[in-house]
Amino acid sequence: MKKRIGIVGAGTAGLHLGLFLRQHDVDVTVYTDRKPDEYSGLRLLNTVAHNAVTVQREVALDVNEWPSEEFGYFGHYYYVGGPQPMRFYGDLKAPSRAVDYRLYQPMLMRALEARGGKFCYDAVSAEDLEGLSEQYDLLVVCTGKYALGKVFEKQSENSPFEKPQRALCVGLFKGIKEAPIRAVTMSFSPGHGELIEIPTLSFNGMSTALVLENHIGSDLEVLAHTKYDDDPRAFLDLMLEKLGKHHPSVAERIDPAEFDLANSSLDILQGGVVPAFRDGHATLNNGKTIIGLGDIQATVDPVLGQGANMASYAAWILGEEILAHSVYDLRFSEHLERRRQDRVLCATRWTNFTLSALSALPPEFLAFLQILSQSREMADEFTDNFNYPERQWDRFSSPERIGQWCSQFAPTIAA
């Protein structure tokens, strides 16, 4: 008998899972409250970049609509402010790519539907889960909307924050000249905030995503509260002022006369994210085990861009486990967690560590930045390992590990 899987939520996790399962002739129904043709009129959803490992999964799923060789980026520029600013670069072994999710998500939905996936366009609440679970061999929940996140218990030991750690101002902009190599820029203004600049394909071609991770109480926090719609010129002038003061490696490539939101006033998001890590399964009153996937399991701040990438990875692993098993109970969830948890948990821990380290600047982290800025080999390794957060956490999970990693590259600098 053909397996029947219900998926609640049409984000990257749910759609990648659905596409994987349809490749293996598994019956898939996706529940979402948004149709593909509604996306173009929405506010900016996020500023997600897909790492090379995620792009490879898209190739395998036959949804690599925008090849990275043409639309992608090839490394990271780094800028660390201070009395003696540091500028350096790290290569990616294979290009990564960012596409406006208002283009990307409807493309995935249409591809899934064309391959036999079914969609039910309706809101699903926590109260609906028990009834839905009776209709499928397995129900997978991939969205935290409508209090669905409360169904999965938060793990306090992996959820150290009770409030947002950054005041975010995120937008798609035009008028920013590309660097000599098309790349992400990660700029750090100690005590004030971080900026991640991402070359991004949007409605009118290539644009620039600016992810401003402003420290709460700092000179930059005002960017999270000043509204573009109230006075566009005043907002843009404020942005130019703050970028020039805190993130000069990006500001120096801006044409003030052209600088503006890329498409419309819908191209900006402001607010904050409360990071959380939850159990990856829940048992309903009817005894059915349901699986949490993507943001509903691991909600991370966007500072390292790990959310969609680990969601895609976890979706692939879940797909493989669905194919390998026929009973979807608590033991099934244990098999799943054994395989997906290292990457998902390490991405969460590395992100949370980075938020804290960039605020507190402990001596071992400052030493890491100093050596990173002087060792191209280390910068290349660090940059490419954005693909592999478990490798990053192997390096950052204790001061001793950071020190040991730095010691590998310090002699090459001295030489």
From Swiss-Prot:
<keyword id="KW-0503">Monooxygenase</keyword>
<dbReference type="InterPro" id="IPR041654">
    <property type="entry name" value="StyA_sbd"/>
</dbReference>
<keyword id="KW-0274">FAD</keyword>
<comment type="similarity">
    <text>Belongs to the StyA family.</text>
</comment>
<comment type="subunit">
    <text>Homodimer. A direct interaction with the monooxygenase reductase component StyB seems not to be necessary for the enzymatic activity.</text>
</comment>
<dbReference type="Pfam" id="PF17885">
    <property type="entry name" value="Smoa_sbd"/>
</dbReference>
<dbReference type="InterPro" id="IPR054801">
    <property type="entry name" value="StyMonoxStyA"/>
</dbReference>
<dbReference type="GO" id="GO:0004497">
    <property type="term" value="F:monooxygenase activity"/>
</dbReference>
<comment type="pathway">
    <text>Aromatic compound metabolism.</text>
</comment>
<keyword id="KW-0560">Oxidoreductase</keyword>
<keyword id="KW-0285">Flavoprotein</keyword>
<protein>
    <recommendedName>
        <fullName>Styrene monooxygenase StyA</fullName>
        <ecNumber>1.14.14.11</ecNumber>
    </recommendedName>
</protein>
<comment type="function">
    <text>Styrene monooxygenase which catalyzes the first step in the aerobic styrene degradation pathway by enantioselective epoxidation of the vinyl side chain. In a two-component system, a reductase utilizes NADH to reduce FAD, which is then transferred to the oxygenase; the electron transfer is proposed to occur via a diffusing flavin.</text>
</comment>
<dbReference type="InterPro" id="IPR036188">
    <property type="entry name" value="FAD/NAD-bd_sf"/>
</dbReference>
